Amino acid sequence: MLIIGKKLSPYALLSISGLLAASDQAVKWLVQQSMAYGEYVSVTPFFNWVHLWNTGAAFSLFANGGGWQRYFFIGIAVVVSIFLIKLILENRHKGEAIAYSLILGGAMGNLIDRVFRGYVVDSFDFYWRDWHWPAFNLADIAIVLGALLFVSSSLLGKKANTNAEPDGSD
């Protein structure tokens, strides 16, 4: 069951994270099996399906670091994942709990890549004319959506708290 009382089931939230990580790995496997490194397939006038590797962080930050970044980002991902699992188990607010679940799923998907491949496989390339957004993957999408959900639920939660009338209890 997804909802227990007013809380979301931590097992459902962790299952969502696992499903996201597994889906991310399935897409990456498909890309690696069907395309050579550096290959791209034009899908629309603004989107390519690509096979690229990223040894760095978002936007290839630290990609030319010489190898240390693999272990650094593995360590960061493990610490963040443990923290997110703790937050999911506490499950204070539904929107935030779902956000943590999305971020955890994305972090796990990219962590698996870093541990077993030494790099993250990217497959989505959006562009306009000659300008390309940095390539990304399903895990990155989950992380960004989770971050946006966290910010919006936090802001909406604060707005709801400021609009609530005092109940007279001190």
Swiss-Prot record:
Please state what class of enzyme this protein is: hydrolase
Signal sequence region: none
Q: Which reaction(s) are listed as its catalytic activity?
A: Release of signal peptides from bacterial membrane prolipoproteins. Hydrolyzes -Xaa-Yaa-Zaa-|-(S,diacylglyceryl)Cys-, in which Xaa is hydrophobic (preferably Leu), and Yaa (Ala or Ser) and Zaa (Gly or Ala) have small, neutral side chains
State the pathway, as annotated in the record: Protein modification; lipoprotein biosynthesis (signal peptide cleavage)
Q: What is its main location?
A: membrane
Give the source's domain of life in one word: Bacteria
Recorded protein name is Lipoprotein signal peptidase
Q: Which organism is it from?
A: Serratia marcescens
User: Which gene carries the instructions for this protein?
Assistant: lspA
